[in-house]
Amino acid sequence: MKKLTALFNLPELKNDIELHNMVLDSRKVKAGDLFVAIKGHQVDGNQFIDSALHSGASAVVSETELSSEHLTVAFIGNVPVVKYHQLARHLSSLADVFYDSPSKNLTLVGVTGTNGKTTISQLLAQWAELLGLRAAVMGTIGNGLFGQIVEAKNTTGSAVEIQSSLSTFKHAGADFTSIEVSSHGLAQHRVEALHFKAAIFTNLTRDHLDYHQSMENYAAAKKRLFTELDTQIKVINADDEIGYQWLTKLPDAIAVSMNADFKVGSHQWMKAINIHYHFKGADITFESSWGNGVLHSPLIGAFNVSNLLLVMTTLLSFGYPLENLLATAKSLKGVCGRMEMIQYPNKPTVIVDYAHTPDALEKALIAAREHCQGELWCIFGCGGDRDRGKRPLMAQVAEQFAEKIIVTKDNPRTEPQSQIEADIVAGFKNMEKVGIIPDRAQAIQFAIESAVENDVILIAGKGHEHYQIIGSEVVHFSDQEIALDFLK
């Protein structure tokens, strides 16, 4: 419960009001709530104030473009409406006050980068649990205490949802939380008032240019987590070109590399000296500021070696002993829809992965090749109503690294599938090894029935998702379920 006057530092109202929750969606308002009316990219919350009042809102905070109106109070009936200049920009701070600064009372780790956010945030929470902590996670797969995750709409929720969720986790006994921090979330100031014990940067490759317009804007949004927000420990992938540039400007950051010859300079550091890949993962010989050793990874692919080193480095920076981390690492498990291997006797191996950018697809195919003695198949599509420029690049990657390719539906949304396919096909030099099967289930069936035992089939793009968005409809669809049906 928070009093209206305390939240906005207002002079005493005649009748101060105790508020239960901050709510952005007028359809979810309950009696006693504060309705937050912000001007979003598509919808202006001010248009829904009447609806919120009808649902029982006890007060409203309304975004105004006039600085002269800031913190002025009007009334609709008996309900106070507080005008707030640049409300969206300051919403994280308001929610931080409303929910009593939950991130100050948690070990909070933010993870940003184009690829690897989900794997790293899930591994952080999983490893924290193995170390005896109660962990929660927020991100693409969902939000909640580890093992009790509820599906989420966006990678990074609204400023209010984040603070509210952190408060819920804290009251449920969590002492550790990992959160995926998207470029949208950073650009829109949704994590502005969070107190990060650490932040991890994975990599930066082409994605979301439909929103950011340029790679420079995209990189600048990511960088804010390390230069403008309250972040104590900065863990950077030094093998990424942007990460390496940032390290030159961040002397207090920790450098993590898979390059044995990496020159660490003045930074704290972690680097792989030798990596032995095998069917069950990898054995990573490393040296670091905290000591040397061998880390046994249960995850396949070189990029997952990088992910795991970033996670272990972060936990080492918190003071967890190296021997404890190496002992507990053996119990780590893979992440749903992230290089998830499905195998049946005498059948091709199927790998389901979320790869939906050119860089991620390349890394997934290279990782799949490690486990392929026959031909490597790649099934992929591209999302509709999204960055068209990456579609031919995805085709180029598939053609370079796979022997057999099937182009299919991803989430076409409201864009014609034929347009998406045309954009993808424009990237192929030779169509001889390419098939187009728009129906995703039929594409998976064809590959499984055509491939032989030593082949590997990478089904890319959807990962953990159990739906397809076709038009404005969301229909049930799971790559894993379809693959299992045809492997049995």
Curated annotation (Swiss-Prot):
Q: Name one GO cellular component term.
A: cytoplasm
N6-carboxylysine-modified residues are 222
Which positions bind meso-2,6-diaminopimelate? Answer: 386, 410-413, 461, 465
Q: What class of enzyme is it?
A: ligase
Q: Known catalysed reaction(s)?
A: UDP-N-acetyl-alpha-D-muramoyl-L-alanyl-D-glutamate + meso-2,6-diaminopimelate + ATP = UDP-N-acetyl-alpha-D-muramoyl-L-alanyl-gamma-D-glutamyl-meso-2,6-diaminopimelate + ADP + phosphate + H(+)
> Binding positions for UDP-N-acetyl-alpha-D-muramoyl-L-alanyl-D-glutamate?
24, 26, 41-43, 154-156, 182, 188, 190
InterPro entries per the record?
Answer: Mur-like_cat_sf, Mur_ligase_C, Mur_ligase_C_dom_sf, Mur_ligase_cen, Mur_ligase_N, MurE/MurF_N, UDP-N-AcMur-Glu-dNH2Pim_ligase
Pfam families xref list: Mur_ligase (PF01225), Mur_ligase_C (PF02875), Mur_ligase_M (PF08245)
Look up the record and name the pathway of this protein: Cell wall biogenesis; peptidoglycan biosynthesis
Q: Which GO terms describe its biological process?
A: cell division; cell wall organization; peptidoglycan biosynthetic process; regulation of cell shape
| UniProt entry keywords in alphabetical sequence | ATP-binding, Cell cycle, Cell division, Cell shape, Cell wall biogenesis/degradation, Cytoplasm, Ligase, Magnesium, Nucleotide-binding, Peptidoglycan synthesis
Does Nucleotide-binding count among this protein's keywords? yes
Gene Ontology MF terms in the entry: ATP binding; magnesium ion binding; UDP-N-acetylmuramoylalanyl-D-glutamate-2,6-diaminopimelate ligase activity
Q: Which cofactor does it need?
A: Mg(2+)
Q: Which family does it belong to?
A: Belongs to the MurCDEF family. MurE subfamily.
Q: Report the NCBIfam families cross-referenced here.
A: murE, PRK00139.1-1, PRK00139.1-2, PRK00139.1-4
Q: Per its record, how is this protein called by name? A: UDP-N-acetylmuramoyl-L-alanyl-D-glutamate--2,6-diaminopimelate ligase
Q: What is the lineage of its organism?
A: Bacteria, Pseudomonadati, Pseudomonadota, Gammaproteobacteria, Pasteurellales
